[in-house]
């Protein structure tokens, strides 16, 4: 029996995608082999990666002057690649809204003068700071955000005013969850293991003028975006199978009605859970309502023993991976695109029952 998987990542994938992949596991489209066994230089695989790029461009309405790169090393590797490729003036502005933004900021400080221009650390990252009038150094090469904070459950509803500077966004946990205007960003990147596919792949969407040979001295060949762009993400062997699964997820999103439909689907799920948390006598959310994520919903009972009891009983009932991040405790329900509305409805039913028995 399949469970309702609320993991923050790797996370739930559309069941029909998994079934399709299972059907093609031993023989992909008459090739007599699995995609896992296929040469990345073969015509069959070339068609897979090209179609994946075509579909994500269509879904996100990506302009022609942006490159789509399928990279390895996860989002964490881009914490270094971003300053290596963009720090011409050795300066950058970071908005610290959680652990992943903080880690990216700390990495950037290795390569240049990274400054924190806003932070929500004062209230345990439970809100998004006002970013309408930031004190950004004039010669900053870029402004960096983590758009959705997986651990703390916050989301930028309005992008920061970068005052003409390039915006770089880690969108790992909100990737393809709603429509996005790509032209507002210089760089968008995300690990796919939360909302798009299996672990081990990051998709980067980068404006072409930012892809140059003018990188920091000592930048490894593999971390130069130009290396990857010039070779259509095939400089070395890519994560072939993850790209194949992502391609299937892109088709699923198109079939579901695209990103507008995804947003409606995700808003419905989030509303069911937040509405319950707002009226519950036992459970409570931990985020400022105006900054709540549609993807990651942290909540607590206020009692660590009760939290642990809830997680244990929920797991036994088929609601798995609800334990909060190890650094913050409590609970967290990650309700990505592939989580059905029924999964959230049944979780809330279980929470009501638990509250009646333990409140």
Segment roles from a protein language model:
Residues 283-314:
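Conserved PLP-binding catalytic core of the aspartate aminotransferase-like
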Residues 3, 316, 329-359:
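PLP-dependent enzyme catalytic core of the Aspartate aminotransferase-like
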Residues 168, 182-193, 202:
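Conserved active-site segment immediately N-terminal to the catalytic lysine
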Residues 33-78, 85, 99, 107:
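Conserved N-terminal alpha-helix of the aminotransferase class I/II PLP-enzyme fold
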Residues 2-53:
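A glycine-/small-polar-enriched, mobile loop at the entrance of the PLP active site in fold-type I
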Residues 76-141:
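PLP-dependent aminotransferase-like
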Residues 14, 192-274, 288, 357-359:
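Active-site C-terminal subdomain of aminotransferase-like
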Residues 9, 108, 120-175:
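Active-site phosphate-binding strand-loop segment of PLP-dependent enzymes
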